[in-house]
Amino acid sequence: MKVEIINKEQVEQLMPIWGETACICYDTPTKFKNGVAKTVLSTGHFSGSRGQYIYFKIEDVPRSLADQMARHSVGTAVNMQSFRYVKMEDFTYYTPSLIEKYPEAKAIYEDTMEVIKHNYNEIVGILNEKGIKGEKANQSARGILPMNTNTKLIMAFTLEALMNFMEKRLCVRAEEHIRKLAKLMRDEVITIIPELEDKLVPACEAKLFCPEGKMACGKYPTKDQLKEILNNHKK
């Protein structure tokens, strides 16, 4: 799994541009733009940041993870490797940690992947012999590729969308591999914008309660539990 921000120079200017944009709202001199940026970040006034995107190049992740990424559709843009235009003749794949843990399961898993790889190439080869080549052959054979076939994508986030993504995907209830990806993305961002370290956090840390209800891990009270705590405090 690899993660890289590909527009680092623009990301370095995200806070100053956001601050300058917000200055117009308050008729504040632009020399104070850095301070204004920190203020609107803390108060959640994101309108001035919505025209700026952070572009992540993400490689060696399973297609199942890429599909989960694409569910974050507000404030994002995604370009994903096409299994139609790209021949996946020697695809690599993701192995879940629980399968890695048990040799018997891992052996079956790896054997299955090799069978699929062989059969994919056999199908493409047969179609090629019939004069069907390129994307027509690839798109006909791609249906047998497993969900854990590794792929790559470039995904852009506004800051607001990225914070929402982190709230969902840094949660311990998120799948292991997308939580790992979220951590890598977070590390990349805060290297450039340290002010975001306490903003790119799971929902419980952002809200001070857990929105997962009965599925809560117990680190923070649920919303109902927090209400009860506050009501008891008022008595």
PLM segments and residue spans:
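Family-specific signature for flavin-dependent thymidylate synthase
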Residues: 1-235
